[in-house]
Amino acid sequence: MSQKRSLVFAIRDFPPGCGTHIDVSSSLNHPAEKAFKHPRTGDVSGENLSFAEAKPEGTCLKRESADQDHIFAAPEHNAKREPAGQDHVVAATTVAYATSSHRQKVEIGNSDCDPTPREKVLEVLSLFKQVYNQLDRDKKARRGGDFLDATSRIDLKTLTVLEKMGKQVNTEKRIGSVPGINIGDVFQYKTELRVVGLHSKPMCGIDYIKLGDDRITTSIVASEGYGYNDTYNSGVMVYTGEGGNVINKQKKTEDQKLVKGNLALATSMRQKSQVRVIRGEERLDRKGKRYVYDGLYMVEEYWVERDVRGKSVYKFKLCRIPGQLPLT
């Protein structure tokens, strides 16, 4: 019986001005990869991505529907515009990936100054891309064995590697804007959202923090289609709550409950707290989704309605805060 070769990841840091450095594009786009297609928990890969098209900013009008049972509305609020970073420069870092069969060195950018938040985000995304591509090329990534080798979700393995290397940024959860993230930034995997601190729960559509006895939403990943039927219209979003086996027709469905993420969204409405919104959009090639940061929203109201199977489903109406940069 042959013995498995181990997979080792190492980091080599050169002083400023040493080593050979290459430039990295400021875009967040990634090369084509194989597609995965779970709407909230699965991540996808595909063609080179670009920023989302501009969408009109509209007013938030009250919802009228015969399906609703009870509506819970938020009080009036005034929101301030959040600034967005503009520069696209990457700080210098050298990373070496070593396996038993080959060794590859990746060098990222060059800077004599401390990196800005934007530079840190672009650096870790470039590193994510390099680690992902190497794992995808390595035959061990497709073999059975330990957890690192057994799963076909290479993006999850990439996330594990970067976390062990301590390469995440914005690791502390926060409400509102995330340093280094611009409206319109495109991500190819939900695991990338965790690496940059935009949304820390790749397996859940609602992320939240605990403040005292309350859970307050920090971000949501919304998806059109499937069983969720999240909708967008001129700065107004209707988001379907979590739970109840909404998308899996093979499992028994249940009524959604006002707990965990759903409760956090309701609390965000009562406390007039900002929520980051990331859209999971179907790609033009229809081979999966990409994830676009849309900006900050406020939860205006929520209600319970019956789905096609007769189960209770929570719906949350969110309105985009005026004054933010549009998607470009």
Curated annotation (Swiss-Prot):
The keyword Secreted does not apply. The keyword Thylakoid does not apply. Keywords: Nucleus. It is found in: Nucleus. InterPro entries: H3K9_HMTase_SUVAR3-9, PUA-like_sf, SRA-YDG_sf, SRA_YDG. Disulfide bonds: none annotated. Gene3D superfamilies: SRA-YDG. Residues 176-320 form the YDG domain. GO terms for cellular component: nucleus. It holds the Pfam family SAD_SRA. This is YDG domain-containing protein At5g47150.
